Amino acid sequence: MKMLKSLSLIPRIVSPFQKCYSTDLISLVGVPRVKISKGQNRYLLVNIHTHGFTKYGRVIVRGADVDNHLAIFDSILEELEPEGICAKILGGGRILNEPDNKKIKIYGTSRTFGGADHTRTRNILQAWTTYKDFKITVKQ
C-alpha cells in the first residue's frame, strides 16, 4: 500500500521538470535566429527567453524595411508572445543586405533602443547557414 502511495506522487514530481525541460525551452529553439529582408533595413538585436527562465536565453536578429525600430519590436512581440516567450532589446542599427553580391554591411544605431553590438550581430549572421559565405562588414 505504501508503494502505491509513493507511485501516486510521481506525476507531481515529474511535471515541473517536464515543463521546464521540454515545452518551454524547446520553443526557444524553434525561433529562427535570423530574419532580415533584402536591401537596406533597420534591425534589432534581441535576447529572448521563456517567461521565468531569464538565465536560458537566446539572442536573435530581426530586420525589416520599416519607418522605425519600434515597428520591428511590435512584429517580434506578435510572433513570440503567443508562445510565452519574452523579448529584451539589446540595441539596434541598420543592415544593408545585398544577397546578389553576397555582402552585408552593419552600421548605425537606433534612436529608440540605442546601438547594438554589431560584432555580435555579425557573428550570429555568420553562424547562420544562409549568410555563411557572405562578406560581412561592421562600421561602429
From Swiss-Prot:
Keywords: Differentiation, Sexual differentiation. The keyword Nucleotide-binding does not apply. The keyword Ribonucleoprotein does not apply. It comes from the Eukaryota. GO terms for cellular component: cytosol. The active site is at residue 69. GO terms for biological process: cell differentiation; sex differentiation. GO terms for molecular function: protein histidine phosphatase activity. Substrate binds at residues 42, 110-112. JanA and janB regulate somatic sex differentiation. Belongs to the janus family. This is Sex-regulated protein janus-B. It comes from Drosophila sechellia. The gene is janB.
